[in-house]
Amino acid sequence: MHRKVILLLTVSLLLRIGFFSYGIFQDSHFDVKYTDIDYFVFHDAAGYVNNGQSPYLRDTYRYTPLLSFLLLPNYYLKWIHMGKVFFVLFDLITGVMIIKLLQGSCQLTKQLILASIWLLNPIVITISTRGNAESVLCFLIICALYFLKRDRLLISGLFYGLSIHFKIYPIIYALPIGIYLLLSSHNRNCIWRLFMIGISTLIGITAPTYFMYKLYGSEFIEHSYMYHLTRTDHRHNFSIWNLVLLLESAGIHLSQSIELSKLAFVPQLTLCAVLPYLLWKSQTFENLMNVLFVQTYAFVTFNKVCTSQYFIWYLVLSPFYFANTTITWRKGVVCIFLWILSQAVWLSQAYLLEFKGQNVFFPNLFFGNIVFFLINVYLLGVFITDIKSRTSFQDNQHKKNI
């Protein structure tokens, strides 16, 4: 391993150790805890499993039982933070896999700069060290893409299927991955390739789902999957649907005929279905990664529930998108500023609500939701335009070569 890679990974590890250690200090000395409230849910659910019971006895546990199994060492070692160590390890290994995936696309120095978007990102580090499990999901997705790039379709499908079992949303990648395999094969064994990844993905989904269902029955399906289709969380929610969810949770409906929040899936899934068209002009693996990035960005922006941990879903794909971007440094700085601003406006009002007890849901917090949505829609447009300009340039170069 090159010494530059070792240096980056060492710094990344030390940063995580620092954040992790500070988190333990804050938890023991301050009223406001560093550890994510969800981590205590995971921990308690693992406690039920450790006693031979269902993790769903823990109120608000809405995840696959596999996650609670991962935290069983908390009880074996009698240390509540052991699960966080696992999440940090998945976080770091994901960074290593990002470096491996970037190999061949650019020089080593650029690879490490791009990988730093994940490895040195304070948002990523904070989320994993607070005890959020998104790093496990990101690891599964990146592994699926790593083996897809190397044409190891059976292994890729297994990782991809397991990621869908872990959380539903990666299923949106099925369409662009299918289009990529279909078009990049140039009619050579394309049906067989689609079949291989399709059957292995199905195994990756159904095998763990079957075993979890055998263990916990219908409550597993209800809490792990069905709940997320109807959830109405309105706390810590950046989404433009936040106010609608709040009103509906209080029994106030803006429409007599339908709950408006149920319409949230329409623009979201429409965009996720339309964006893979960007693959038609350029069927390279690099362009597939670009499409997955903008597709995920659109999914998060238009989702009816959007919290900071959801940003991880597209941040893990961002190094591949920025590898060959045509966005200038000046415009890039503006985009980063706007992205931070969109969160800062909302967080300023959320602070007044959470810590000052002020009733700022409307219009203050709603205004923050609108600002967040509009800025992120603008950024999505910038990213899509960037991809289209790259494919147009490649198309023109191809015509010149002919």
UniProtKB/Swiss-Prot annotation:
Subcellular location, in the record's words? Answer: Endoplasmic reticulum membrane
**A Pfam family of this chain:** Mannosyl_trans
Q: Which organism is it from?
A: Kluyveromyces lactis (strain ATCC 8585 / CBS 2359 / DSM 70799 / NBRC 1267 / NRRL Y-1140 / WM37)
- Which family does the entry's similarity section mention? Belongs to the PIGM family.
Bilayer topology: Multi-pass membrane protein
Q: What is its EC number?
A: 2.4.1.-
- Its protein name is GPI mannosyltransferase 1
Q: Could you say which enzyme class this protein belongs to?
A: transferase
Pathway(s)? Glycolipid biosynthesis; glycosylphosphatidylinositol-anchor biosynthesis
Q: Which GO terms describe its biological process?
A: cell wall organization; GPI anchor biosynthetic process
- Going by the entry's taxonomy, the superkingdom of the source organism is recorded as Eukaryota
